[in-house]
């Protein structure tokens, strides 16, 4: 009886172990969209938000994803809808140069290989991502070259000079 109970417990452990391991996504099809901050006057950092809709040929759903941007890793959150994911990060305005940012997405297996390669100081570019999204950031607008206060003061001084000159010319 004890052997049967231990065999049942072993079978339960094996089944729970199999159910926790996620299946790899085969031939991912993505529909990406993204947003980047364009106005540096009203914000302190440049924000990048990438949203994707993911479908796999083998119909894997709700898989854990991780994103890598320029050597920094970020967790990818799942949306309420099936197959919707989002990742976001922020940079200082000076660090967020205009150009294209490559966001590489990894599943759990390839992400663990990426982290292992980083720990061992190996080349991480040889680890293929599940898919890649290119984010085009046009840069941030820092406001006009001359602030409106300085411009208003300069115009006021010019008007004062013209009025004073006209008064002096009339009295002469």
UniProtKB/Swiss-Prot annotation:
Subcellular location(s) per record: Endoplasmic reticulum membrane
Topological type in the membrane: Single-pass type I membrane protein
Cited Pfam families: TRAP-delta
UniProt-recorded name of the protein: Translocon-associated protein subunit delta
Crosslink feature (Glycyl lysine isopeptide (Lys-Gly) (interchain with G-Cter in ubiquitin)) location: 72
InterPro entries, alphabetized: TRAP-delta
Matches recorded under PANTHER family: TRANSLOCON-ASSOCIATED PROTEIN SUBUNIT DELTA, TRANSLOCON-ASSOCIATED PROTEIN, DELTA SUBUNIT
Disulfide bonds: 25-56
Subunit and interaction comment: Heterotetramer of TRAP-alpha, TRAP-beta, TRAP-delta and TRAP-gamma.
Gene Ontology CC entries for this record: endomembrane system; endoplasmic reticulum membrane
Residue stretches spanning the membrane: 144-164
Taxonomic superkingdom: Eukaryota
UniProt keyword annotations, A-Z: Disulfide bond, Endoplasmic reticulum, Isopeptide bond, Membrane, Signal, Transmembrane, Transmembrane helix, Ubl conjugation
Biological role: TRAP proteins are part of a complex whose function is to bind calcium to the ER membrane and thereby regulate the retention of ER resident proteins.
Broad class of the protein's primary localization: endoplasmic reticulum
Topological domains annotated Cytoplasmic: 165-172
Signal peptide start-end: 1-24
Family: Belongs to the TRAP-delta family.
Lumenal side, ranges: 25-143
